[in-house]
């Protein structure tokens, strides 16, 4: 069983408890289905108990966390809460003196600002669209749109996120998560990496059985009447974005699994199975390692499992990799994407829940 101190590092004393589960009474706001499941179902009780333990340490700068968490912004707030836990796991000091960007973190003399963003559900996902079209067209366009909205944003003084007094001349990261479909995180990382670097990669094996990786340049992404250029990081105008951070597992199920392994299923009423795909360290491997296991109090999943940082090769203020040791890091060199990760690091996962 992991102690709470190992789940998130506590740099300050508990503040005023934010009761996110006391349902708001607002006739103009509909309570989200996701919140209802978390708040009322036995299956998600470990997640609910874990979040209740975390919230006294979380500072609601905007003052609207509870309302958004329960209504239209559930996924976005789960993503922010996940990031909070991850940055604590990496032993960053989180400075909440500023309302924007979403996070201002410090470690080893480095200061970094982060703005969070999500891809939300759209009507197009109710249509019968082929998975290849989603990966190769729709999702890159949607990632591009979400990232562009953060780049174009200015405050009342016409300043961008990286131009504030406390953020200028420091690295700036956009942390983006795909909530556009229940399982889209499993495959959307390919869409993101293709959009950012403008290359896809084909694989083949030579006669000796050695793996060959062939880069293939992508000019743009098209879907219906929308066209978006590929290679976001290759444009000098985007040099202020030091990196893009994303995770294939920054969801409610992450809180469920860590809640389970932390002892919040006291009587072991839930059977939680995790189907996962892991990085294969074999240099000739072209497919991930597949595994199915039960989540127990002996499990040791980290917040950083499944998290990737995509580094901008043209960043004005690059990110130092050693500050994020639990993340998988992606770099672009000579038309190839170089990935630095731990052996058997998590690529993606699916969670199955049943009551014993």
Features from the language model and the residues they span:
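Interdomain/boundary linker segments immediately adjacent to catalytic/signaling cores
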Residues: 7-74
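Short, charged/polar micro-motifs that form catalytic or ligand-binding hotspots
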Residues: 69-77, 164-169
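Short hydrophobic-acidic sequence motifs that mark active-site Asp/Glu residues
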Residues: 72, 111-115, 173
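TRNA-binding/sensing appendages of the translation machinery
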Residues: 76-84
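A short acidic/basic microdomain associated with nuclease active sites
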Residues: 84-106
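Conserved catalytic cores of phosphodiester-cleaving nucleases, focusing on short active-site segments
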Residues: 87, 103-105, 112-120
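Metal-dependent nuclease catalytic core centered on acidic motifs
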Residues: 120-291, 295-304
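Charge-dense, extended regions
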Residues: 263-356
């Amino acid at each position: 069983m992991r102690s709470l101190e190992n789940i998130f590092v506590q740099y300050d004393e508990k503040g005023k408890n934010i009761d996110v589960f006391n349902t708001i009474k607002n006739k103009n706001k509909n309570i989200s289905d996701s919140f209802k499941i978390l708040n009322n179902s036995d299956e998600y009780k470990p997640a609910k108990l874990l979040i209740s333990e975390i919230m006294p340490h979380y500072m609601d700068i905007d003052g609207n966390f509870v309302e958004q968490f329960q209504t239209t912004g559930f996924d976005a707030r789960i993503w922010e809460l996940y990031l909070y836990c991850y940055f604590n796991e990496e032993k960053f000091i989180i400075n909440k003196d500023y309302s924007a960007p979403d996070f201002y973190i410090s470690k080893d003399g480095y200061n970094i600002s982060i703005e969070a963003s999500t891809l939300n559900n759209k009507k197009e996902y109710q249509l019968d669209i082929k998975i290849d079209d989603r990966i190769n067209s729709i999702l890159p366009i949607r990632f591009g749109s979400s990232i562009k909205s953060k780049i174009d944003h200015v405050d009342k003084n016409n300043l961008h996120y990286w131009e504030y007094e406390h953020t200028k001349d420091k690295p700036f990261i956009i942390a983006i998560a795909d909530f556009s479909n229940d399982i889209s995180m499993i495959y959307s990382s390919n869409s993101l990496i293709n959009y950012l670097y403008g290359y896809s990669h084909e694989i083949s094996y030579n006669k000796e059985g050695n793996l060959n990786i062939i880069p293939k340049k992508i000019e743009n992404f098209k879907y219906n009447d929308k066209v978006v250029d590929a290679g976001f990081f290759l444009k000098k105008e985007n040099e202020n974005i030091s990196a893009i951070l994303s995770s294939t597992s920054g969801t409610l199920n992450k809180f469920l699994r860590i809640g389970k392994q932390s002892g919040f299923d006291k009587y072991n009423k839930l059977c939680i199975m995790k189907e996962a795909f892991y990085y294969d360290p074999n240099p000739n491997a072209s497919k991930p390692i597949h595994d199915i296991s039960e989540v127990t109090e002996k499990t040791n999943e980290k917040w950083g499992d499944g998290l990737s940082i995509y580094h901008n090769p043209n960043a004005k203020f690059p990110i130092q990799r050693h500050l994020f040791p639990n993340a998988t890091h992606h770099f672009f060199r000579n038309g190839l994407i170089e990935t630095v990760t731990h052996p058997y690091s998590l690529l993606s996962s699916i969670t199955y829940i049943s009551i014993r």
